[in-house]
């Protein structure tokens, strides 16, 4: 399964790169190089903190990318864990497959607003009280940090979303509510989209509400 999943995700990254080259070849990406460096620096710091501080870091855990295993990983902080007793009682203690159909809540935070408010020093960056004001107060205080989207997203498969989402969702259980940080190349990459600049790390709150269709492992020898 891992081999097939790696092949699928690698293909998805290639497709994203192909689309970016064909749709955005008139864009001067040198205009975004400083922004790219800022996003890389933040990811480097977060990975360093997580590695050295473990559960004392604000983002306490990472997920190794199947598509880019040697690069920066997605990071996450558990807001609310799944209720293990209830999940076991209804025999749904599983995580999605790449082909599963899901329902979820998510909040996407504006990358530039987050960047402007992230602390510079290590102690503040890993202080939950300080960091929570960036990611939680914003839902009620638009002047602190305006959430870009608050959406109940349903009836989609892992394969239909950005690579970072696909990889994170396959580690979540129903009821898990996480704050996640996704490196730009596992998000919208160099191309960006209509509302996200190129080279933008993305920050989400993600809650897996249900797995409406479990799907299954990608078959070996599928040719993908």
Where would I find each of the regions flagged by the language model?
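Sec-dependent bacterial lipoprotein signal peptides
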Residues: 1-21
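Cross-family detector of peptidyl-prolyl cis-trans isomerase
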Residues: 5, 21-224
């Amino acid at each position: 399964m891992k081999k097939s999943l790696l092949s699928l995700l690698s293909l998805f990254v290639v497709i994203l790169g192909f689309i970016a080259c064909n749709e955005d070849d008139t864009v001067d990406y040198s205009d975004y190089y400083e922004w790219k460096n800022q996003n890389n620096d933040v990811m480097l710091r977060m990975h360093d903190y997580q590695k050295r501080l473990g559960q004392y870091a604000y983002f306490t855990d990472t997920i190794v990318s199947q598509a880019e295993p040697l690069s920066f990983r997605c990071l996450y902080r558990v807001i609310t864990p799944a209720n293990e007793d209830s999940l076991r009682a209804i025999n749904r203690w599983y995580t999605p497959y790449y082909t599963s159909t899901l329902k979820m809540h998510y909040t996407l935070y504006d990358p530039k607003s987050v960047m402007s408010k992230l602390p510079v020093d290590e102690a503040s960056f890993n202080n939950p009280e300080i960091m929570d004001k960036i990611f939680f107060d914003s839902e009620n205080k638009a002047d602190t940090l305006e959430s870009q989207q608050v959406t109940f997203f349903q009836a989609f498969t892992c394969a239909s979303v950005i690579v970072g989402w696909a990889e994170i969702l396959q580690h979540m259980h129903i009821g898990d509510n996480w704050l996640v940080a996704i490196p730009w190349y596992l998000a919208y990459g160099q191309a960006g989209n209509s509302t996200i600049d190129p080279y933008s790390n993305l920050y989400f709150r993600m809650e897996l509400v249900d797995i409406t269709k479990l799907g299954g492992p990608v078959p070996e020898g599928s040719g993908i």
